[in-house]
Amino acid sequence: MRIIIVLLAFFISLSGFSQVNGNTAKLQRPKLVVGIAVDQMRWDYLYRYYDRYGNDGFRRLLNGGYSCENTMINYLPSLTAVGHTVVFTGSVPALSGITGNDWMDQLTGKTVYCTSDSTVQGVGGSSPNEGKMSPRNLLVTTITDELRIATNFRSKVVGVSLKDRASILPAGHSANAAFWFEDASGHFITSTYYMNQLPDWATRFNNSNIIDSLIVKGWNTLYPINTYKQSDPDNVPYEGKFVGEQAPVFPHPIKEIYASNKSSIRNTPFGNTLTLQFAKAALDGYNLGRGEATDFLTINFACTDGVGHMYGPNSIEIEDTYLRLDKDLANLFQTLDQKVGKGQWLLFLTADHGAANTVGFMQEHKLPGELTSPSRLVDSLNRRLNELFQVSGLVRSISNNMVNFDVNRIYSSALDFDAIKKAAVDFLQRQPEIVIAVDISKVGESPVPEPLKTMIGNSYYFKRSGSVLIVAKSGQLEAFYKTGTSHSKWNPYDTHIPFILYGWNIKPGRLNRTVNMSDIAPTIAALLHIQMGSGSVGQVVTEVIPAK
């Protein structure tokens, strides 16, 4: 009996010891999360070029990861700043405040850029006045913010892109750093929001002249040009060209073009490779994925957007850009395997938006497509409203698919705003290029079909949004895009995007039900066992969460 009592006392003391010192079981998380947004990547690019991809890039993700095949944007407009915000917050423009790449302040009439911040200065660039950027216009937290909070800020978060908005907004408010490319200097820069000087490794990278080595041979096709059978012929009238070129054909003399215009790197695949190399330098510079807490690296490959805008989705240039990006991704995955460890990193790949086919391509193949002029529409709408209300200039502009009224003039003139909006809707719906015009405050009672009705509701933030929304005919682009393409509309070519999860705790699979872009962040939160962002409205993709 004495022995039993002694043993009981011993085990009770062990139990007390374990309670004091904590359970030895540790919450499992990946060492590193990598969030990739491929700018302007239509979902169909995964399969259009599938037979040409290697085994270690896109195919590695598709064959070894979990692909949500019907991931859709659930708001308007489908633009870069908004897309990156929704991906990394799980929110929508109505709550996040990021309603476009820029927007008109409805009270002042001033145009505001999404990441502009006059209280900070640029760091590492040509001038402190360049790079005055931060996430302060973002009204909610990101998944990257929530990871920092969950680990008591032991996690490190870094954003990388050629575009400021595609680095700053994903990295969130509390990021250790966000870096982007400055055309004037040809360097990656940041702002005093994050730091007062560039890290030594970033300065060394900027001084390494890596761009010169990437463009020294110009831009020719990666493979023989006659193998690019998924694309138009090389010389078509609806593709753009660089200044100085006689025709939009290979080879493109990028070395000479870049010497006089550094922004031209954005319209080549080499800017993606530059982004990859800087991201790898940041991986080492911040020792990401090698500490005690989970780190997060966000990467935007922006040149798929630049090439798409210039040449369009059916060009040899865009096909070549994706074949080269496939190799860049393979390089990144190999680096992660070596430096973080196979199975130790979690990655997701998505896009901020898609793109329309060029108008010339559509017309050539007898498909719906035409050019339109928002400025002409503003002029004619103002004339009509002046006839009805005897006050000129009631409409300031049309942007982000919305009509921006001069609300100060309307109220100071004692006009009925509802009557003005009704008159605007009546006029706009009679225009041949418009399918739907709707007063956003009345969209709930309108005959607008789903999913458009929900998309419109998700888009409206009064201080930064116009009051009447326009839905244009399918295939329409602004008159500026006589060559190349653009995006911003509700149509599937703009809103059907890839979403693939790969790596830590992810089993291969396919999901064909509809998933919204706003579901991405809460799904990552669930995988990491952390809180969703403060404005999250998305749903967890439960099919990808491992069973207990």
For the regions a language model picked out, list residue spans one by one.
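Bacterial Sec-dependent N-terminal signal peptides
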Residues: 1-25
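Active-site-proximal N-terminal segment of extracellular/periplasmic enzymes that hydrolyze or transfer
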Residues: 20-66
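Short, structured active-site-proximal loop/turn typified by the sulfatase FGly-forming signature C/S-X-P-X-R
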Residues: 46-96, 156-160
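Secreted, luminal/periplasmic, and some membrane-associated catalytic domains
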Residues: 53, 70, 79, 101-130, ...
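Non-catalytic, well-ordered alpha-helical segments in soluble enzyme domains
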Residues: 59, 140-149, 400-438, 513-539, ...
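His/Asp/Glu-rich, glycine-adjacent segments
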Residues: 92, 97-293, 302-309, 430-436, ...
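A long, amphipathic alpha-helix that forms part
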Residues: 265-291, 304-345, 423, 524
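Substrate-binding rim/cap in mid-to-C-terminal beta-strand-loop elements of soluble/periplasmic
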Residues: 372-415, 486-528, 542-548
